[in-house]
Amino acid sequence: MTLSGKISVKAETIAHVVKELESISQKYDEIAQNFGKIAQLNYYSSEKAAHSMENGYSSAATVISGLKGPLSTLGGGVMNSAQKFFEADEHWGTEFAKLYYNIEG
């Protein structure tokens, strides 16, 4: 593939992209920490765990949905990946709950 012209990016745009990516990374780190806590069975069954996960997902979705302009394509890609992650998390959370509470079906 050849480029017929030059591509230029302002330093401010690069700084903005980096800032947004750092924000997304921070939110996913928070979610990962919550998953670590959920590995403890007594924490998984608590209402606090549900609220922690809900807040983490909500924060990450807010950051991602706020990406505008040149970052909108990036935001769409991240949101697609996040949606697949959320769906898988919901599935495995349900499977774990079945095991924990000895539910069939």
UniProtKB/Swiss-Prot annotation:
Primary localization class, coarse: secreted
Compartments where found: Secreted
GO CC terms in record: extracellular region
Deletion phenotype: Deletion abrogates the production of EsxB and affects the secretion, but not the production, of EsxA and EsxC.
UniProt keyword list: Secreted, Virulence
Oligomer and partners: Forms heterodimers with EsxB.
Name of this chain's protein: Type VII secretion system extracellular protein D
Organism field: Staphylococcus aureus (strain USA300)
Organism lineage string: Bacteria, Bacillati, Bacillota, Bacilli, Bacillales
